């Protein structure tokens, strides 16, 4: 066996009986043939071809390694094979050299049948008369051992000269070199960790550093106040060199959980990884128009006409502090130092009384995509959410889907009010940029549905265009059955395409509740007769595709009167989604096939079994680095797309591969198509 893991734990005693040739006999049967010495204790026993006392010793004590005292073979009873490797200390090689040296010494002690005879009285060896045949077996044994060693040496040299032997030697050298590199890397990591621990031990804790940073300048003389962060004069150059680490990938920034805020962190991570949404807020500069954003008043928003520059000054001051820290070498990947530095950028509360979600998104996205920070605490963002969206105030667990809808609605309201109320006070460049941001917010998730109702009496079709910002998909009926004996939900799978097909399938309206325009066209308005009601069918189809398709899987169902439970079935979804089967037929002929292709961009996952509890995480695709990231609050891990597709998705985000201006057909063309279809059918048909 080339590699035995039990040899690494070998610890041989210095007074072992194997080093004394007079003890090379079995302690049970006293034979000297095929003698094996235990490498864990001083026990010596015979092999399996004699009485198998060595195996019995292993079964009793559990000592796996034994060495043949004459052939110097090492056998492992646990691996059931001969051992060819050695431990890092080289104990087996040293032991073999010692045994060869001991064997080479001259032994004058007489033996009988391989046993040394000693006197019980004097303790001296009793010399017995040796017979002529007595020396012949010893000579033959010595000659056999010599031939064995010569043959083994010849075979070893021949094997080393062969191609297979050369390859094996090269592989062994590479493994040894790799092991040396790993050991060197481990040694360097231990040294870096030791130096970091020494440095952190001499640095003030995070809380005191934050309080010192927020101390007013006029609170006391500069000499009497201790510095919040070590300056370049006090820190050695070697330590500064150690702190400066390579820049991180943009977007790989965790968000600290501030108390059941995982729903907010997961949604913010998803929005920041949607490239078009992120770029429009990064280009927006709210500091120039901050006085025009609404301010909070008891949970409601109102406009302020008095301009103020406090927030702009604070924002620039925070950025200057962050850049100063970076120049001094304090932007390293240490957990404690990161927390202290990030307090410079994200305060616990907005310094200005004018609360703006757009400003907080702009600031937060800048930090997350700067490539300098591994963790940020979104205090200001949470405070703004509490002020502008009172339903999410407090530390209760909230629904991520509801938070996403409310957040986008408030951002849209804020941009619309900012662009219309104080239009003349906004610079033209910022006015144009604000319009672009509002356009992106309004259109990135916006799509349109075609609601088509068909009268069963006359087969007349009536079309209505309805907007949508996400598609809430229900599970098939078999997952809503909670009767006894039903197959458990966690043992089955559901296809995303099946849920989309259920969303766009034709459903019959219950009873005669539809007032058809065609059936009531001959009836006069002044006619006192009631409207003619008929049965009808309804179908929803996608009329206009959005740039980012949000699919909300309705996992929570009502079980009883006041209890909601979760449908824990796995939904199978692919990295590429084709929306062509779910669009109206007139739309298919007017658009390119590539327009219907969507690529998976993000997944929000709910961990847990019930509504109002559990935990939210997000899987996001980083467009800058081209990899997937699992965002679990402050912990971020790179993962594969196969890992993402195995998650229990709650909200899916798909980005349109090709965006075309002609993403929908005109309503005039649609009405013409429907009118032509109705005219071609001739007389009304009745369906049973």
UniProtKB/Swiss-Prot annotation:
The lineage of its organism: Eukaryota, Metazoa, Chordata, Craniata, Vertebrata. Zn(2+) 1 binds at residues 4, 6, 76, 79. It is found in: Nucleus; Cytoplasm. GO terms for molecular function: cysteine-type deubiquitinase activity; cysteine-type endopeptidase activity; histone binding; histone H2B deubiquitinase activity; zinc ion binding. This is Ubiquitin carboxyl-terminal hydrolase 49. The keyword Zinc applies. Zn(2+) 3 binds at residues 38, 41, 57, 63. Residues 169-230, 293-315 are annotated as: Disordered. A zinc finger (UBP-type) spans 2-99. Its main location: nucleus. Zn(2+) 2 binds at residues 26, 29, 46, 53. Belongs to the peptidase C19 family. The gene is USP49. Signal peptide: none annotated. Residues 253-657 form the USP domain. Keywords: Chromatin regulator, Cytoplasm, Hydrolase, Metal-binding, mRNA processing, mRNA splicing, Nucleus, Protease, Thiol protease, Ubl conjugation pathway, Zinc, Zinc-finger. It comes from Homo sapiens. It catalyses: Thiol-dependent hydrolysis of ester, thioester, amide, peptide and isopeptide bonds formed by the C-terminal Gly of ubiquitin (a 76-residue protein attached to proteins as an intracellular targeting signal).
């Amino acid at each position: 066996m080339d590699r035995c893991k039990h040899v690494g734990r070998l610890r041989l005693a210095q007074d072992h009986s194997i080093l004394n040739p007079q003890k090379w006999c079995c302690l049970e049967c006293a034979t000297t043939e095929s003698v094996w010495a235990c490498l864990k204790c001083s026990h010596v026993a015979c092999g399996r071809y004699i009485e198998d006392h060595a195996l019995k010793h292993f079964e009793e004590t559990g000592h796996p390694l034994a060495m043949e005292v004459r052939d110097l073979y090492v056998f492992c009873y646990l691996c059931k094979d001969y051992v060819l490797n050695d431990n890092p200390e080289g104990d087996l090689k040293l032991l073999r050299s010692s045994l060869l040296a001991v064997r080479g010494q001259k032994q004058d002690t007489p033996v009988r049948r391989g046993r040394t005879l000693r006197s019980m009285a004097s303790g001296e060896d009793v010399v017995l008369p040796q017979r002529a045949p007595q020396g012949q077996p010893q000579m033959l044994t010595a000659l056999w051992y010599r031939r064995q060693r010569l043959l083994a040496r010849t075979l070893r040299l021949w094997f080393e000269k062969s191609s297979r032997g050369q390859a094996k030697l090269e592989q062994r050298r590479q493994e040894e070199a790799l092991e040396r590199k790993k050991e060197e890397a481990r040694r360097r990591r231990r040294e870096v960790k030791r130096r970091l621990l020494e440095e952190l031990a001499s640095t003030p804790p995070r809380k005191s550093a934050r309080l010192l940073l927020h101390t007013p300048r006029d609170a006391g003389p500069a000499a009497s106040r201790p510095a919040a962060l070590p300056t370049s004069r006090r820190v050695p150059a070697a330590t500064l060199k150690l702190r400066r680490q390579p820049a991180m990938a943009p977007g790989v920034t965790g968000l600290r959980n501030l108390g059941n805020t995982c729903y907010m962190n997961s949604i913010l991570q998803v929005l920041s990884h949607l490239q078009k949404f992120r770029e429009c807020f990064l280009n927006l500069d709210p500091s120039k128009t901050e006085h025009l954003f609404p301010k909070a008043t008891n949970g409601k928003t109102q406009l302020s006409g008095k301009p103020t520059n406090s927030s702009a000054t604070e924002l620039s001051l925070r950025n200057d502090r962050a850049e100063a820290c970076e120049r001094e070498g304090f932007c390293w990947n240490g957990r404690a130092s990161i927390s202290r530095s990030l307090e410079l950028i994200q305060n616990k509360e907005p310094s200005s009384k004018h609360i703006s979600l757009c400003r907080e998104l702009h600031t937060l996205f800048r930090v997350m995509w700067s490539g300098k920070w591994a963790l940020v605490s979104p205090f200001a963002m949470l405070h703004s959410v509490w002020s502008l969206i009172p339903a999410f105030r407090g530390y209760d667990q909230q629904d991520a889907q509801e938070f996403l809808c409310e957040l986008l609605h408030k951002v849209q309201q804020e941009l619309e009010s900012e662009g219309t109320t104080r239009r003349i006070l906004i610079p033209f460049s910022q006015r144009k940029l604000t319009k672009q941001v509002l356009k992106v917010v309004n259109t990135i998730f916006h799509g349109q549905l075609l609601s088509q109702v068909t009268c069963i009496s006359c087969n007349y079709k009536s079309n209505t265009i309805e907007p949508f910002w996400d598609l809430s998909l229900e599970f098939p009926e078999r997952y809503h059955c909670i009767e006894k004996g039903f197959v458990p939900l966690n043992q089955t799978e559901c296809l995303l395409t099946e849920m989309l097909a259920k969303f766009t399938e034709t459903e019959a309206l219950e009873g005669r509740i539809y007032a058809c325009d065609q059936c009531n066209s001959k009836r006069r308005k002044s006619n006192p007769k009631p409207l003619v009601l008929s049965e009808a069918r309804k179908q929803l189809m996608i009329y206009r595709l959005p740039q980012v398709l949000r699919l909300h899987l309705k996992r929570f169902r009502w079980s009883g009167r006041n209890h909601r439970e979760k449908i824990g079935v796995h939904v199978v979804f692919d990295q590429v989604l084709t929306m062509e089967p779910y669009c109206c037929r007139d739309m298919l002929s007017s658009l390119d096939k590539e327009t219907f292709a969507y690529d998976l961009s993000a997944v929000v996952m709910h961990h847990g079994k019930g509504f109002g509890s559990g935990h939210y995480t997000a899987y996001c695709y980083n467009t800058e680095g081209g990899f997937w990231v699992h965002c679990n609050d402050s912990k971020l891990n790179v993962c594969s797309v196969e890992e993402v597709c195995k998650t229990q998705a709650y909200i899916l985000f798909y980005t349109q591969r090709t965006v075309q201006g002609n993403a929908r057909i005109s309503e005039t063309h649609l009405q013409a198509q429907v009118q032509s279809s109705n005219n071609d059918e001739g007389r009304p048909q009745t369906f049973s």
